[in-house]
A protein has these predicted regions:
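Walker A/P-loop
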Residues: 17-37
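Pre-Walker A (Motif I) flank of P-loop NTPase domains
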Residues: 16-22, 47, 108
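N-terminal pre-P-loop "Q-motif" helix
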Residues: 1-18
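SF2 helicase catalytic motif II
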Residues: 114-117, 122-160, 165-170
Length: 174
């Protein structure tokens, strides 16, 4: 996969830093940076990665984008929308899905929304990496507990929080 120079710099920095923000204008390739980072982690060993989106439709779109490139992964959606992938909002089912993946040494990729992120928290599963797309949505009061939990949890690379911001104002500066 060929990355543009600014995307390669982002990936290099992500490999060096456990937490950070990627601020790139709309259409600048933030999703490709997430996918490239996730792909590297999956090659390195078993991982559970969570992708958080503000809306169900965006979670589904991100899932489609990831799965065009990453195919050796078990996928789950944690939101109330319909999807062709396994989907639940029940913490026990999330935990069972994780345990099954762990038993068989499978990488796991979970797509969720800010509204449902607390269900993953309640499941108690360890998360290696979490990507917050449109992270400005995470500051809403009823999302804050779950986002803070994942930002401060010390599971292997769970603390490697990548905050992805889509800032339309930056388009004017570019």
């Amino acid at each position: 996969m060929n990355l543009r120079p600014h995307q390669q710099r982002i990936i290099n920095k992500m490999n060096q830093t456990p937490k950070g923000q990627v601020i790139v204008p709309t259409g600048g390739g933030k999703t490709m940076c997430m996918i490239t980072d996730a792909q590297r982690q999956f090659v390195e060993g078993y991982n559970t990665i969570v992708v958080v989106a503000p809306r169900i439709l965006l979670a589904q779109q991100l899932s489609n984008d990831f799965l065009k490139i990453i195919d050796n992964v078990k996928v789950m959606h944690v939101h109330s929308g319909e999807t062709k992938h396994y989907s639940t909002t029940k913490p026990n089912d999330i935990g069972n899905w994780f345990c099954k993946n762990q038993l068989f040494g499978e990488n796991g990729l979970i797509f969720t929304t800010y509204h449902s992120l607390h269900k993953i928290q309640q499941s108690g599963i360890p998360v290696n990496t979490i990507y917050f797309d449109e992270a400005h949505n995470s500051v809403q009061q009823h999302f804050h507990t779950a986002t803070r939990f994942f930002a401060t949890t010390n599971n292997r690379r769970c603390s490697s929080l990548l905050l992805l911001l889509i800032i339309a104002i930056m388009m004017k500066e570019v």
